[in-house]
Amino acid sequence: MKNAKMIGFGLYTPKNLVENERLQEFLETSDEWIRTRTGIERRYISLDENTSDLAVEASKKALSQARLSAEEIDLIIVATVTPDNFTPSTACIVQDKLGAKNAWAFDINAACTGFIYALKLGRSLIRSGEANNALIIGAETLSKALNWEDRGSCVLFGDGAGATVLTSTEEDCGIKCVNVKSDGSKGDSLVIQGLPLNSPFKDGREVSENYINMNGREIFKFATKVMEESIVEILEKENIKIEDIAAIIPHQANLRIIDYVVKRLGIPREKFITNLQNYGNTSGASIPIALCESIDEGNLKKGDNIIMVGFGGGLTWGAALIKL
């Protein structure tokens, strides 16, 4: 049976690097306060590049590594909560900028779990024969959704993009399994407000502040629970031992969350790939950025089994087992 194999990887960040110390210039915070509570030391903040721009640059690298032209791509999925516009979709903008004229393109919004959701869709479409070469992208410019006066949230996030090319294969490799779940009843724990209902037929006009609003305590409890459960579930479902897993790539939200899960599972800390100290929380881009960086640095190789695990607004969560 056909499967979807990863054959190209690319990441991209804006040029504007913001160390923790720069945040002290306008926030009541410090490098020590941020590092001890989150593990974050720096992040990239876009000055003039939108989500599609970051996605395009990451995609160019992935296509180059895959040795495919843009015209050979027949599917583009962008996972993002910070699109350029409501419409056209960021994926359609990426399609145009790349010259991928044979691809159909759309966005999905599953917040920080978005890349895992996108992998599930890409894999399913390739297995069904609806696509042959798919470009799967996680890209965010979260800086435009931040309240830069709220030190509890604005210090956490960064901008960036990661992309991978999936292709159809008969080989015993690729995306082995993807489990995703949702719980909309707890969606108010992490919100970026949309436009309010605001018509001339309604009494009074509403004003919306489209900032990230997060209940940190609730998200911590949720994240640690579902990350642990997702890892255990996918190991049991695929009948694979943790010793056979080369690496686990978690959503890069907070070092405390990752360390808590490591302790709960009793898995060696070195199996967990973390790079949030350099990028912050890039939402749907965090897992592909960590994946691509690990590939680039030679920390992952062909034949390795890896688990990606994420959680995010919605609430959403999920995990994927992949043989590179």
From Swiss-Prot:
GO terms for molecular function: 3-oxoacyl-[acyl-carrier-protein] synthase activity; beta-ketoacyl-acyl-carrier-protein synthase III activity. GO terms for biological process: fatty acid biosynthetic process. CDD domains: KAS_III. Residues 252-256 are annotated as: ACP-binding. The active site is at C112, H251, N281. Pathway: Lipid metabolism; fatty acid biosynthesis. InterPro entries: ACP_syn_III_C, ACP_syn_III_N, FabH, Thiolase-like. The keyword Acyltransferase applies. Catalyzes the condensation reaction of fatty acid synthesis by the addition to an acyl acceptor of two carbons from malonyl-ACP. Catalyzes the first condensation reaction which initiates fatty acid synthesis and may therefore play a role in governing the total rate of fatty acid production. Possesses both acetoacetyl-ACP synthase and acetyl transacylase activities. Its substrate specificity determines the biosynthesis of branched-chain and/or straight-chain of fatty acids. Homodimer. NCBIfam families: fabH, PRK09352.1. The last Arg residue of the ACP-binding site is essential for the weak association between ACP/AcpP and FabH. Belongs to the thiolase-like superfamily. FabH family. This is Beta-ketoacyl-[acyl-carrier-protein] synthase III. It comes from Clostridium perfringens (strain 13 / Type A).
